[in-house]
Amino acid sequence: MNIIKRGGTEVPFDKSKIVTAILKANAQAKECDKLSNIDEMSEKIASHIADDIEGNLLSTGSVPNVEDVQDMVEEFISKSGKFKLAKSYAIYRYEHELLRKKNTTDDKILSLLNRNNEEINQENANKNPIVNSTQRDYMAGEVSKDLARRYIYPEDLMKAHDAGIIHLHDQDYQANTMTNCCLINMEDMLQNGTVISGTKIDKPKSFDTACNIATQILAQIASNQFGGQTINIYHLVPFVDISRQKIKKSLIKEFESVGIPYDEDKINKITENRLKEEIRHGVQTIQYQILTLMTTNGQTPFCSIFIYLDEAETPSLKKDYAMVIEEILKQRILGVKNQTGIYIAPTFPKILYVLEPDNIEDDGEYYYLTKLAAECSAKRMVPDYMSEKKLKELKEGNVFGTMGCRSLLSVWKDPETGKAKFWGRFNSGVCTINLPDVALSVMDDMLGEHDITEYTERDMSKFENLWSTKQDEIKEKFWKLLDERLKLVYDAQIIRHKRLRGVPSDVAPILWQHGAFARLKPGETIDKLLFDGYSTISLGYVGLYETVKSLTGKSQMDPSVKDFALSIVKHMKDICDSWNKIENIGFSVYGTPEESTTYKFAKSLRKRHGIIKDITDKDYVMNSYHTDVKEKVNAFDKLTNESPFQDFTTGGAISYVEVPNMTKNIEAVLAILKHIYNTTVYAEINCKLDCCQKCGYMGEISLIRDSNNKLIWKCPQCGNTDQNSMNIIRRVCGYMMNANVVNQGRLNEFENRVLHL
């Protein structure tokens, strides 16, 4: 068994250290409070306590951290009847904590530099903490976290964060005045020119050049934000005809210069052939540049490309757009080569493909593109799909992309034109509420059960019986505590908002001065873009499944409690609407992806509320409103059941279905897409895309438990367990990522996923 130290390193568990700590506290206690007046007997009792603690830890199957073990030491000393000794141990622990607080970052930074910080290794599946540039970002992040903890956030918010009641996202960037995610106004930057690193960039004169400039813009913007970015591929489409005319003119000149006769038809055919080659090259530039560029965040840009065919203003633009879309899909189907030369699915850019009558109906002119998209989904797990029909219902007739992964803007109309604007807007950040903790805190109170440890096994039938007899009282207490917890989120987000107020445009010229968001003057503050709903700031939530299960004993999709589940999400939306009116800020409800937060919240729930079947007996919490990963439900019912929750999660959310290998059953994929079009704002199809670099195996690589009961990947063909010599692609939180380096909580969630088809 291993244990995670405070600095994040994972080391073998050594129970002798527990014995030593107990005996040191024992030595400071009065004679009457000691374990025994005889030293040998005290050591024997301390050893028994250490044995009991080790047994409890082994029974959980998870890797504990030092704080968990110290809590258990206090608890077990108290159980032995030595309450004053337990207090002495707490004082001993507190004194050592004060010494550590003199410098809160050294241990973590040193473990990072020594490449043995297990927490950081598993924190972000797209950041390799061994690489120098990534290490520098993590080092800066540790300093930022320290500043956020000691200077930016008040103690009550940090305590709530540490206890897992809320999660203050992206603390590693809070010291900086940076924004989260955005929709880049690429149209303005390409058509009117921009400035990159002090160099003036004029309007491109070809599609190929436009693609190259777009990727340079992306890298610059990603380095000035901490979240994802989305570009609209349609903003590149006008350059297709510019290239067409350029190629045509060049061809005529070539033919004339050598005296070869030509006709219009021949020129047009050659032009279109060369144009397709340029489109292929331009799309390839976007694909490879995004994958190989590294931002100052030490990672590939978290980039999405948005595809909405009906956006084209003319038939000719629509045909050019279709050519670009077709090439994007064909290149993604091909994939990119890994280190051993095997074609695999690239993780970026994410593709957002809008389903509309022209491309989803069998007789639609562009249905062939959706068939290609379905083939791509079956082989490479992209695109993600957005429904024109549902978006227009929820967003006042507008269709636009998510900002990076899932964050979705509200409608904002330019007061000068009266028209809705989306490209060039952004999100300021997220704070997430742990909904299951609200529910379990209420149930603990209702049951009068407060003396709970993380090893207390709870009787779920008590929860169910209480709901059947005291439903109204439970609801009253739940709404009251929920509002108290939401106030914490509100306070945190007001602090975040105020951090951005007064910031000059000079901090990120490409964002604020050169077109990505605005064309502000040097020295002008960004304040006007923080109000009136131009930008958003998010109230995230997780664990609706565990919340409803805790209160009622049923899944949130059970017809008898689904209305109550919906009322929880609606309540959060109503709260955000009220905050908007008070502050004139764009608060929105957001379905939090919780890549690493899922493990943190799961551990905190177990620590605060004990072991409860299907709620805290696992190492993860369900994303937002998602159905339990273990629940057996078909893909169509899952999407239908989850759809109403998206309607209230207006700040962005994703539904997904888990499917087997669908490369031989594209018709079934198309059936799912048609269902998405009719029911769901935003959804994706998950399959298994793995490759063992040692033997070349392509298929699903297995999850097993090693000798420390830790989940690891193992190749079913050659038995390889070297986690660094595999390509394991899973969709974790809306993004595809390298799942061989995610945390144990997320691996536990993978382990429990069932197929929906």
Across the structure, where does each feature detected by a protein language model lie?
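Short connector loops/turns at beta-strand edges and beta->alpha or beta->beta junctions
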Residues: 23, 27, 436-440, 547-550
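Long insertion/accessory domains within large nucleic-acid-processing enzymes
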Residues: 717-757
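Contiguous, well-ordered alpha-helical segments that form the cores/surfaces of helical PPI scaffolds
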Residues: 537-550, 570, 731
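Charged, amphipathic alpha-helical regulatory modules used
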Residues: 1-115, 751-755
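Conserved catalytic cores of very large enzyme subunits
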Residues: 95-533, 554, 558-721, 727-728
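Metallocofactor- and cofactor-centric catalytic cores in central/energy metabolism, strongly enriched
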Residues: 279-283, 287, 549-550, 737, ...
